[in-house]
Amino acid sequence: MKKFLKMTAAFSLGLSLAFGLFSPAQAAPDTSVSNKQNFSTDVIYQIFTDRFSDGNPANNPTGAAFDGTCTNLRLYCGGDWQGIINKINDGYLTGMGVTAIWISQPVENIYSIINYSGVNNTAYHGYWARDFKKTNPAYGTIADFQNLIAAAHAKNIKVIIDFAPNHTSPASSDQPSFAENGRLYDNGTLLGGYTNDTQNLFHHNGGTDFSTTENGIYKNLYDLADLNHNNSTSDVYLKDAIKMWLDLGIDGIRMDAVKHMPFGWQKSFMAAVNNYKPVFTFGEWFLGVNEVGPENHKFANESGMSLLDFRFAQKVRQVFRDNTDNMYGLKAMLEGSAADYAQVDDQVTFIDNHDMERFHASNANRRKLEQALAFTLILARVPAIYYGTEQYMSGGTDPDNRARIPSFSTSTTAYQVIQKLAPLRKSNPAIAYGSTQERWINNDVLIYERKFGSNVAVVAVNRNLNAPASISGLVTSLPQGSYNDVLGGLLNGNTLTVGSGGAASNFTLAAGGTAVWQYTAATATPTIGHVGPMMAKPGVTITIDGRGFGSSKGTVYFGTTAVSGANITSWEDTQIKVKIPAVAGGIYNIKVANAAGTASNVYDNFEVLSGDQVSVRFVVNNATTALGQNLYLTGNVSELGNWDPAKAIGPMYNQVVYQYPNWYYDVSVPAGKTIEFKFLKKQGSTVTWEGGSNHTFTAPSSGTATINVNWQP
């Protein structure tokens, strides 16, 4: 759903909002902690578990793996789930306005200490898994994890786990004794290791040089034992493992290294999640400075998960921290990403994380960080704050960006910026669901508006720390009146006076000033703000959030197919739960009509799957191509494009697992279904179809498969 309107715009926040945190009694269904499909109303706080708080010293590793002073940042420092529970219960997180936490991968990691260039390294970070069905004892037990879930939910905080199914742990093909040989366990039972891999659980194609997407998927990431997702044992194991964590009550998943796993397998993984217990899921696909990445957008639009918005993070750092771009560049990024992502509001924004240098430098002006936080918290998308950012932590690359949090002060300006703005995501639907418009801009100043129905929020930012800005000619969607700065002048903001037609009186925005103004009003007509999940099979219940649906059941439309009655399992003014009807697989627009027949806006690009999904590798031999031609796959199911060359799967690969003129691609297809398919060559708008009759293949009911055929001239 495109939500950046390419015209001048501004955020307006009205006086009608009370600025306290929502209590459980006040929470609308769409803003509730029980809403696992929608994080648009949430603020995520990313916690590197080992570096946050040591609540139970008894579970700390012993010997050379542990440094209680946290001087050696490659060793365990003692943070655990009990420490997070303590900071939930003492009000540090709730007081900041945090409504979701993203914690380190909770699974059991290797115990070996690995010496790299004379420096000891441990699995403190959680990314060196050995058993995806057990916990990391340095973080806590299963009971401790359940206590964390319960404590978080009691304080209206959702829990997201990091999950890294790309690999296990460091391994060497030449030295079976290196570390733990990448060994994989199933709840304590050994499945296999990297050497003597008779079951083919892992890839053995060498290390990636990152030169192509294919190279990054089917070769090892550094020295990490790369899991073979086309292996049925690996596939079923990983899908069973995530179901275990879903059963433990998690509310979301952050998928590590999605650029480095087969896209078809990941779509089948998301189908398994959505068909079981759907939760908000977002992946990590790194983008560098000024990198746009069409494959990144395609993945976000078609995989069933959203992404960490590195494009956003890199541009915000350029504009607010490094001064290497200006507000016009920031605006162009916002408009570009809104056009490229089908559901831009589901992408997760941030200004720093564990894979980047900290935003704040030790001697830098703190106002830069404070402005970046304010900008991020009010924008469309789901904001995530890296632990310690509110304490102005600094640090370069890994591991210096992963130090222990120095304090839990609630008096820093950064903490208070978050505290004042985070609650608005639940109290003003313009911030959670609204369109975005630029209203006033020059090199240093951006004023933008979020609007949803009659709800408005306006943000003004002057990044010039030395010169005030004279603002004239500003027009907003705010009703006539006077609006106080929601930040209360914390960042030198001012009151805004608005006359008839939304015209604001001229004013001066202070040097380094940031102000937020808002207005809220009831929404009389049905307006959809969010749908989740955005991909599932018929019969799965999805959640539609917004405003103005009314209290009596109406009708939900998937394209022209109407759903009513018992197939709508819940209908409230801000939320509808509905079962996907028995329609053919494909892309559908969703809309709602209330009991009186008044129709809502259209929410587009919902994918109905043809059924349960499995990952199948399609291989075609001896398909020669001319320079500039690529090979694609299509067939008689929507997952293969329904014979439409424009929707065909590809371009296929031909370098790593199979080599030219043989091609391959891993695709998510309906389980147990007999599929007809063909290959085709594309070069620009020119399409050359494979000859002969259609190939046929029956997909397995579970696990994975490979279908290998010859090109038919």
Curated annotation (Swiss-Prot):
Record-level GO BP terms: carbohydrate metabolic process
Signal peptide annotation: 1-27
Record site: Transition state stabilizer: D355
Cofactors required: Ca(2+)
Annotated Gene Ontology cellular component terms: extracellular region
Record's cofactor remark: Binds 2 calcium ions per subunit.
Root EC class: transferase
IPT/TIG domain span: 526-607
Name of the protein in question: Cyclomaltodextrin glucanotransferase
The UniProt record lists the keyword Iron-sulfur: no
Amino-acid positions noted as binding substrate in the UniProt annotation, renumbered to this chain: Y127, W128, H167, N220, L221, Y222, D223, R254, K259, H260, H354, D398, R402
A Pfam family recorded for this sequence: TIG
Domain CBM20: 608-713
